[in-house]
Amino acid sequence: MYTRTKTKKVFVGDVQIGGQNKIVLQSMTIAKTKHVKKSLKEINDLVKEGADLVRIAVFDDADKRAIRKVVDQSPCPIIADIHFNPDYAIAAIKAGCKKIRLNPGNIKSKEKLREICLLANQYNIPIRVGVNSGSIPYDLMREYGVTSTAMIIAAQRYVRMLKRFGFDNIVISLKTSSALLSMQAYELGAKKFSYPLHLGITEAGTLINGTIKSVAGLTPLLLKGIGDTIRISLSTNPVDEIKVAKKMLNSLGLYENLVDVVACPTCGRLNFDLFKVTKEIEEFVKDLHFPLKVSILGCSVNGPGEAKEADIGIAGGKQEGIIFKKGVVVKSVKQEYLVDELKQMILEEYELFKKKNGK
């Protein structure tokens, strides 16, 4: 099996995919590429949240003409999403996109596919071979149905098309809307291909449903070392895709650059508005990109003991709460000042982090 540390290295601009334990985060704009200002606003928001790469759709000639404007002003490498029209892929490469996503089976002209491969080699641009369960070739559907086997054979077929034209700078995705089928496809893909794998559950759904389905389908793969880059596909603001990806990877020990706020589920001992406080702290730390675990607990009965794994935290009360570090109580504070004290401690930890890391 080719785990992420053993897959081939592919570079999207200066971003490495494969051959390492880092999972590259990406998302896709929902603005039309021709709407340059809106596209750039989304791209900047995504990068601020932690995206390494952003994909844009090239749907028509107006989008094609706008690519260079977007690429030239983007703070991260841009990926072009191409369907059917080979001229858009060629234009995207020439306009400075650092990666192309396409389905080689949708490019009817073999001469055009050859031209794309030659140009991508010239510009050192990788191509993601995107296999989707909804577009499995008819002959494979007829023989195998919508199965992981059909998807892998389709991917092998598309890879051969590219290699026939001397192109081997490849990333592969095997997307379905089923968590179980996705797991099967990617596990089989990790055995068959040494190319980096782009993980994702397509058409996953809205924020809650899509998050549940994506985490259910991708976590087992990530724990097995499968997957080099990831997009959490959600029917919501693209920034939420990066937030969910970071939280999921952080819970698996694969992403550190965030403040992890944990809180107890509460019980009858609760004497303050823990839900409100937790949301307030989550909002407070959302732009602080550094590793810290903050615990917010409902009472002092189990507080410090339950929070030993947290860096800092609080346990609230009716009139007074406690503040602790690494499970050790450091002070008692009137309840009305508890949240402000916690915020100050978080900022102090952030300043220490910046000083230690020369930021």
Curated annotation (Swiss-Prot):
<dbReference type="GO" id="GO:0051539">
    <property type="term" value="F:4 iron, 4 sulfur cluster binding"/>
</dbReference>
<dbReference type="InterPro" id="IPR036849">
    <property type="entry name" value="Enolase-like_C_sf"/>
</dbReference>
<keyword id="KW-0408">Iron</keyword>
<keyword id="KW-0004">4Fe-4S</keyword>
<dbReference type="GO" id="GO:0141197">
    <property type="term" value="F:4-hydroxy-3-methylbut-2-enyl-diphosphate synthase activity (flavodoxin)"/>
</dbReference>
<dbReference type="InterPro" id="IPR011005">
    <property type="entry name" value="Dihydropteroate_synth-like_sf"/>
</dbReference>
<dbReference type="GO" id="GO:0016114">
    <property type="term" value="P:terpenoid biosynthetic process"/>
</dbReference>
<dbReference type="GO" id="GO:0019288">
    <property type="term" value="P:isopentenyl diphosphate biosynthetic process, methylerythritol 4-phosphate pathway"/>
</dbReference>
<dbReference type="GO" id="GO:0005506">
    <property type="term" value="F:iron ion binding"/>
</dbReference>
<dbReference type="InterPro" id="IPR004588">
    <property type="entry name" value="IspG_bac-typ"/>
</dbReference>
<protein>
    <recommendedName>
        <fullName>4-hydroxy-3-methylbut-2-en-1-yl diphosphate synthase (flavodoxin)</fullName>
        <ecNumber>1.17.7.3</ecNumber>
    </recommendedName>
</protein>
<comment type="function">
    <text>Converts 2C-methyl-D-erythritol 2,4-cyclodiphosphate (ME-2,4cPP) into 1-hydroxy-2-methyl-2-(E)-butenyl 4-diphosphate.</text>
</comment>
<feature type="binding site">
    <location>
        <position position="299"/>
    </location>
    <ligand>
        <name>[4Fe-4S] cluster</name>
    </ligand>
</feature>
<feature type="binding site">
    <location>
        <position position="267"/>
    </location>
    <ligand>
        <name>[4Fe-4S] cluster</name>
    </ligand>
</feature>
<keyword id="KW-0560">Oxidoreductase</keyword>
<keyword id="KW-0411">Iron-sulfur</keyword>
<keyword id="KW-0414">Isoprene biosynthesis</keyword>
<dbReference type="GO" id="GO:0046429">
    <property type="term" value="F:4-hydroxy-3-methylbut-2-en-1-yl diphosphate synthase activity (ferredoxin)"/>
</dbReference>
<feature type="binding site">
    <location>
        <position position="264"/>
    </location>
    <ligand>
        <name>[4Fe-4S] cluster</name>
    </ligand>
</feature>
<comment type="pathway">
    <text>Isoprenoid biosynthesis; isopentenyl diphosphate biosynthesis via DXP pathway; isopentenyl diphosphate from 1-deoxy-D-xylulose 5-phosphate: step 5/6.</text>
</comment>
<feature type="binding site">
    <location>
        <position position="306"/>
    </location>
    <ligand>
        <name>[4Fe-4S] cluster</name>
    </ligand>
</feature>
<dbReference type="InterPro" id="IPR045854">
    <property type="entry name" value="NO2/SO3_Rdtase_4Fe4S_sf"/>
</dbReference>
<dbReference type="InterPro" id="IPR016425">
    <property type="entry name" value="IspG_bac"/>
</dbReference>
<keyword id="KW-0479">Metal-binding</keyword>
<dbReference type="Pfam" id="PF04551">
    <property type="entry name" value="GcpE"/>
</dbReference>
<comment type="similarity">
    <text>Belongs to the IspG family.</text>
</comment>
